[in-house]
Amino acid sequence: MLVPGCANALTARIVEDLGFEAAYVTGAGVTNMYLGLPDLSFVSLTQLTEHVAAMRDCTELPLIVDADTGFGNAVNVGYTVRQLERAGASCIQIEDQVFPKKCGHFDGKEVVETEEFIAKIKAAVDARDHALIMARTDAAACTSFEDAVDRCRRTLEAGADVLFLEGPRTREEIAKIPEAANAPFLLNLVYGGNTPILTQQELAQMGFAMVLYANAALQAAISGMQRVLGHIKTTGSIDGMQSEVASFDERQRLVNKPFYDALEQKYAIG
């Protein structure tokens, strides 16, 4: 299954409109787009919960939510899971980085001890009502690939439903990941990141259940805005860039304006 990342509710609508089966609420994307900051643990649980609720209000897709390190220790993780589940999360991802965490493709990451990570996953599993729990490890870049594989196995034993080994650097490492445990694995493909970009077909043959493009939509939006706004700045007009810009009607369709037009007519007075 291909899963695009969403940094806001409009992106979630587009993902659903294009026929994808799930959406990923990207912590990096929310931080970049909402705060204009790098992925260095600036988003709060309250802010993340508000974004999840907004996405849930406008899409019926399953939402996989990046909860970073869980906003604290194992006790805090339980609270985080309950809050995000109430907001509409279908699957909640908890990772093993030290707080403040960094983007999985940044240098200088650190991970907590395995036992602390296992405690967080157990707390998440105990706290959830219906949401799946995804365990993500960044250990491959911090300790060793073998340690990352071991953490995947240990979190599966602790009750995790989906496993996510972040940052493999070679095709050979990628191929080894689904062999690590009898569980669904997700692979994150970041354009410009540390992991080689393979096709969905190649990854399915290796045994991956999900392929995540966490910030492809965000990076595409940045590129599009730079091209169009750069053209306007240079020429003083949008002429020549029409193919780069969604039509006014398409914009209104995506935000479901016809539905609200019908409501206005239904509840009109007089």
Where are the regions a protein language model picked out?
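Extended, intrinsically disordered, low-complexity segments
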Residues: 217-270
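Alpha/beta enzyme core
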Residues: 1-213, 220-231, 266-270
